[in-house]
């Protein structure tokens, strides 16, 4: 059971791809009007268009008095590494696109196993000393790497990471076993991405859909489709969702919440996220309508115990083939 409701962060991955400037701008406004303040983007999202769109909104990001917090990431992909020069290039390019002097949170998007981590961390510390970001974050690192990084930073007097962004939802709970205790020990808060398992937990898909023609989504018609298919498109996942849908109908009858409502409420009320420790859920979207629906669901209350039990049964069905939280 969650302790106090986790915060909500706006995931900007689809800005500049499935969302144009107008819908992106409207989504940011809708998000901020509900009292949320943090936006998450990355150097690689939509080939830089996500950051560019956010920078053009005139939010005054990274400046004194700005209530909106912005996070971005450097990644070892598309010809880049996490060597010092590439980390600097990515962050400084992100700052130009975002039109801000500094970001509130700068992540290492995932590990670069070809670069000694000490080199990357020292480069991050230098960039922090230059005032180019406030907090350091990690994403997609295995728990022993997190422990190693925290130990190295403490030993060398470098900036310590304070946030970890990882994959977590009702049917993807690998992070609970070893990563969460590690993060609590070192004082990192956890930001969950894929809270709806790429859309699988909306309940709108059937296993057989993989063989037909489908509208564009995380699973179909985009550069990351195969990644998401490999993560979540397994028969046991659909069997688990059916268990939850049955429990919803049995427990609530004709007024049963939707599958997506149940999945969002599980994240905010029944997961291991703790609002008191600064944990958060990253909500992405492919349209303004979808975002407004999900933001309304965030404000709903806890689920009945029978539905929480059904989510646990679903997790037990799929745990053996849970995708790794690290790369």
Swiss-Prot record:
Question: Which GO molecular function annotations are given, in alphabetical order?
Answer: aldo-keto reductase (NADPH) activity; identical protein binding; NADP+ binding
Give the regulation of activity: Inhibited by citrate.
InterPro entries tied to this protein: AKR, AKR_Detox_Biosynth, NADP_OxRdtase_dom, NADP_OxRdtase_dom_sf
- Residues where NADP(+) binds: 13, 18, 40, 140, 194, 196, 198, 204, 218, 286, 290, 293-294, 327
- Identify the residues that bind citrate: 109, 228, 231
Q: Which Pfam families match?
A: Aldo_ket_red
Q: Which GO terms describe its biological process?
A: aflatoxin catabolic process; aflatoxin metabolic process
Q: Where is this site: Lowers pKa of active site Tyr?
A: 73
Entry GO CC: cytoplasm
Q: Which UniProt keywords apply?
A: Cytoplasm, Detoxification, NADP, Nucleotide-binding, Oxidoreductase, Phosphoprotein
What name does the UniProt record give this protein? Aldo-keto reductase family 7 member A3
Query: Which species expresses this protein natively?
Result: Rattus norvegicus
Gene name of the record: Akr7a3
């Amino acid at each position: 059971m969650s302790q106090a409701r986790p915060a909500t962060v706006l995931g900007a991955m689809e800005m500049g791809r499935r969302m144009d400037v107008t819908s992106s701008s409207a989504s940011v406004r809708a998000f901020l009007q509900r009292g949320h303040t943090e936006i998450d983007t990355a150097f690689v999202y939509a080939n830089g268009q996500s950051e560019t769109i956010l920078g053009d909104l005139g939010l005054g990001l990274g400046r004194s008095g700005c209530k909106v917090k912005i996070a971005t990431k450097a990644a070892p992909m598309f010809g880049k590494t996490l060597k010092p020069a590439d980390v600097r290039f990515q962050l400084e390019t992100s700052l130009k696109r975002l039109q801000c002097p500094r970001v509130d949170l700068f992540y290492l998007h995932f590990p670069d196993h070809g670069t000694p981590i000490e080199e990357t961390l020292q480069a991050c510390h230098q960039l922090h000393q230059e005032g180019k970001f406030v907090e350091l974050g990690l994403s997609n690192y295995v728990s022993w790497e997190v422990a190693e990084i925290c130990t190295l930073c403490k030993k060398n007097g470098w900036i310590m990471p304070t946030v970890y962004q990882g994959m977590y939802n009702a049917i993807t709970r690998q992070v609970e076993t070893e990563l969460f205790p590690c993060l609590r020990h070192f004082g990192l808060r956890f930001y969950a991405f894929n809270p709806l398992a790429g859309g699988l937990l909306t309940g709108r898909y059937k296993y057989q859909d993989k063989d037909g023609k489908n509208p564009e989504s995380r699973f179909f018609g985009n550069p990351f489709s195969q990644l998401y298919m490999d993560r979540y498109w397994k028969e046991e996942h659909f069997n688990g969702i059916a268990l939850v849908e049955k429990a919803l109908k049995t427990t609530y009858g004709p007024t049963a919440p939707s599958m997506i409502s149940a999945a969002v409420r599980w994240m905010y009320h029944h997961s291991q996220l703790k609002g008191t420790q600064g944990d958060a859920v990253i909500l992405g979207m492919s349209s303004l309508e979808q975002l407004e629906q999900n933001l309304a669901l965030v404000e709903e209350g806890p689920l009945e115990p029978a539905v929480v039990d059904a989510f646990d049964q679903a997790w037990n069905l799929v745990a053996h083939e849970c995708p790794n939280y690290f790369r």
